[in-house]
Amino acid sequence: MNKPRKGDLRVWWIPQVPMKSFFVPVGNLHEAKLILDTLADYDMFQLKNNIKPDFSNAGGLQVFNGDDWYTWYNHEGNDFDTVADLLDSE
């Protein structure tokens, strides 16, 4: 994996809390929403089809600030969950 650059985005996902998270680099907010929705749908599919008895997942979007990864917020201070709802209406 290439060294991250300032402004790079990545999705983080924990399929079963308290497991470690894994990360998926994304190019924009639409890609992030697609990945997060797909991972959530996959977990729900596994539950509904008795592949796993239950789950407690978590996920989100991070941005690299040049030194470390931080939770992504837009310029108005909204988190990704709030902004993702707006992406559906575009």
Place the predicted regions along the sequence by residue.
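Short acidic/polar mixed-charge low-complexity motifs
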Residues: 18-20, 67-68
